[in-house]
C-alpha cells in the first residue's frame, strides 16, 4: 500500500467517524444513523462486496454485505462490527469537536475511532486491499454491521434468528477489540458479559430513630451493601454458588499459549495465580 492510498484510507475513516451516531440518543439522531448506514452500505459496494443491503430496524439499519466467490467448499468468515458510538459527555473535555475527526501526530482523534468504526474499517480496508492486489479473497466473507451495540443490540438477536442461512459461517470475527500497541493486533478469546439483577430489601415498616435503634437494627442500605459485597471474593471472582458451573474452561493448548505470550503482550511477568479470561 502506497502513501496516497494510506492517506485516502484515513480520509474515508474521517468521513465515517463524522456521523454523530449516538444510539443512546436515538430520538435526535435518527437521520444521522440512517445516513451513516447508507454511507457504510455504499462503501461496501465500492470496495467490492456484493448482495449489500440494509435490514431493520429502520431507525438504525443493520448493514449486510458478502463476497462468496470462493465457492461452497471454501470456509466462510463472518465479520461483525457496529457503527453506533457512545455519548460525548462532557463535551468541554474534548480538545477538538468529537465529530470532526482530526489527525494529531500518528493518531486520529474523534468519537468512534476506537470503538468501533476504526476497528470495523480495518477489516473493510483489508478486504479492499486483497481484492485490488490479488483479485480475490482467500475465503468467503460475510459482513454484518449494526447500529445498536451501545444500547444492548435490541434487534440483533431477532435478525440472526431470522437469517441463519444468510449468516451461515465457519468462523466469526468480532471487530470490536483493541491493540496492545501499534502493529501488534490482539486476538481476544472472549469478553466479560453483563448480568442485570434487581435486589429488593424489605426492612422496618417505618422510620426508626437512629439514636434509639441504630445499634440494634441495621439500616436497609447497610444490609444491601453487605449483600452486594458478598457477591465477590477478594480476588475478584464471583462468590455465587454454581455461577461457574456452565463456564467453559480454556483448553490445555489455549492455556499454554496464553502463559507463553502473556508477558510479551503485556510487558508484565506471568502471574500463575491470575485467572484466565
Show the residue positions of the predicted features:
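Short small-residue beta-strand/loop micro-motif enriched in glycine and branched aliphatics
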Residues: 108-110, 205-211
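Generic secondary-structure signature for well-ordered alpha-helical cores
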Residues: 18, 45, 132-135, 164-165, ...
Amino acid at each position: 500500500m502506497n502513501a496516497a492510498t494510506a492517506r485516502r484510507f484515513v480520509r474515508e475513516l474521517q468521513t465515517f467517524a463524522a456521523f454523530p451516531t449516538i444510539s443512546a440518543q436515538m430520538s435526535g439522531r435518527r437521520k444521522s444513523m440512517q445516513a451513516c448506514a447508507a454511507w457504510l452500505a455504499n462503501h461496501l459496494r465500492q470496495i467490492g462486496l456484493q448482495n449489500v443491503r440494509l435490514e431493520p430496524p429502520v431507525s438504525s439499519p443493520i448493514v449486510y454485505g458478502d463476497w462468496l466467490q470462493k465457492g461452497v467448499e471454501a470456509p466462510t468468515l463472518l465479520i461483525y462490527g457496529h457503527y453506533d458510538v457512545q455519548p460525548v459527555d462532557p463535551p468541554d473535555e474534548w480538545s477538538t469537536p468529537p465529530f470532526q475527526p482530526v489527525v494529531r501526530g500518528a493518531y486520529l482523534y474523534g468519537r468512534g475511532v476506537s470503538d468501533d468504526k476504526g476497528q470495523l474499517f480495518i477489516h473493510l480496508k483489508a478486504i479492499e486491499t486483497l481484492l485490488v492486489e490479488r483479485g480475490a479473497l482467500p475465503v468467503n466473507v460475510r459482513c454484518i454491521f449494526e447500529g445498536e451495540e451501545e444500547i444492548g443490540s435490541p434487534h440483533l438477536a431477532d435478525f440472526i434468528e431470522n437469517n441463519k442461512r444468510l449468516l451461515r459461517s465457519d468462523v466469526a470475527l468480532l471487530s470490536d477489540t483493541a491493540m496492545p500497541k501499534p502493529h501488534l493486533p490482539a486476538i481476544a478469546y472472549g469478553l466479560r458479559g453483563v448480568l442485570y439483577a434487581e435486589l429488593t430489601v424489605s426492612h422496618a415498616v417505618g422510620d426508626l430513630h437512629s439514636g434509639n435503634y441504630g445499634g440494634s437494627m441495621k439500616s436497609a442500605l447497610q444490609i444491601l451493601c453487605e449483600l452486594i459485597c458478598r457477591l465477590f471474593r477478594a480476588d475478584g471472582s464471583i462468590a455465587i454458588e454454581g455461577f461457574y458451573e456452565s463456564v467453559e474452561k480454556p483448553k490445555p493448548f489455549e492455556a499454554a499459549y496464553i502463559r507463553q505470550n502473556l508477558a510479551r503482550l503485556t510487558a508484565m511477568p506471568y502471574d500463575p495465580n491470575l485467572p484466565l479470561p
